[in-house]
């Protein structure tokens, strides 16, 4: 297992494969971990495909556990899209790359959009797989934050630490909140969490909720920001309560250089998803080679 400290946070990551660099933002909501790219952990999104193994045959893949997820650490501060992409930029630099194709799945697509807004020169293309958004996604996030806030008000932060090892992460057990995962992994984080001023902690959690689940638009970028993303983008749509088809349509409408795959999830397979990713990225690789 490889770890790097970026922005003061210990980040569990993997860099493997060969070929053009592919920066990968994992699916899973607040379970955004490397294993969600594997055959076992990612079978919902990738069907029969082991995505990391398959993509590593064509790309130099950079995958990681997002901060406050899996084996990565965290910090108690207002969470935002700006914070979420800082570790990714650091990992890109760690890999010695200045540019990458950027693949984001589920909530990872929101991070891919946020990354493109802040680092457009680092993005060769955007691959947005099952982007999150819509009313039901917003209400899921806000409801989970409400459950955490109610739990902390009733039982305190020590109860979060006690419950975290069984709950594993915020998306599986909302009561433990966004910082339950690092509390379950890192003893020093677990010892510091109960010492937080309760009012300050609750305010930080509320600010995080309002930054990440503020409207029914596709998550990760505002409408105005989406209209300024010039990066060539390929949208692989979802169609359920978290990955609303309307979110993919909104991205296609607002992003000036976006294409929308005309297959819904029930028609998507690991094989045809991989084929579309390779088709889209190879076009830009061949064009870049012709210009060099």
Positions of the model-derived regions?
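Gly/Ala-rich beta-loop-alpha elbow adjacent to hydrolase catalytic centers
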Residues: 104-108, 112
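Short beta-strand/loop motif that positions the catalytic acidic residue
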Residues: 229, 235-237
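Conserved alpha/beta-hydrolase "acid-adjacent" motif
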Residues: 241-247
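Catalytic active-site module of serine/aspartate enzymes centered on a nucleophile-bearing elbow/loop
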Residues: 256-292
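Conserved HGGG/HGGXW glycine-rich cap/lid loop of the alpha/beta-hydrolase fold
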Residues: 6-73
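Conserved acidic catalytic loop of the alpha/beta-hydrolase fold
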Residues: 82-100
């Amino acid at each position: 297992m490889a770890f790097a400290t970026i922005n003061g946070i210990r980040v569990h990551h993997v860099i493997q494969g060969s070929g053009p660099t592919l920066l990968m933002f994992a699916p899973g909501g607040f379970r955004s971990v490397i294993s969600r790219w594997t055959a076992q952990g990612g079978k919902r999104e990738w069907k029969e495909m082991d995505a990391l193994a398959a993509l590593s045959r064509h790309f130099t893949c950079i995958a990681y556990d997002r901060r406050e997820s899996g084996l990565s650490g965290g910090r108690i501060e207002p969470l935002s899209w700006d914070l979420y992409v800082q570790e990714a930029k650091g990992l890109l630099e760690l890999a010695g790359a200045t540019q990458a194709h950027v693949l984001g799945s589920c909530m990872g697509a929101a991070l891919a959009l946020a990354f493109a807004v802040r680092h457009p020169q680092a993005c060769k293309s955007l691959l947005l797989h099952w982007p999150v958004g819509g009313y039901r996604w917003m209400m899921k996030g806000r409801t989970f934050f409400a459950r955490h806030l109610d739990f902390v008000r009733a039982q305190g932060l020590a109860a979060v630490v006690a419950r975290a090892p069984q709950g594993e992460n915020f998306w599986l057990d909302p009561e433990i909140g966004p910082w339950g995962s690092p509390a379950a992994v890192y003893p020093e984080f677990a010892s510091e969490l109960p010492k937080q001023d309760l009012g300050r902690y609750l305010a930080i959690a509320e600010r995080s909720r309002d930054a990440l689940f503020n409207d029914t638009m596709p998550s990760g970028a505002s409408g105005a920001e989406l209209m300024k993303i010039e990066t060539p983008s390929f949208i692989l749509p979802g169609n359920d309560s978290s990955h609303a088809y309307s979110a993919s349509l909104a991205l296609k409408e607002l992003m000036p250089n976006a294409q929308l795959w005309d297959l819904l999830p029930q028609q998507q397979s690991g094989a045809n998803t991989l084929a579309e990713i390779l088709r889209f990225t190879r076009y830009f690789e061949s064009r870049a080679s012709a210009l060099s």
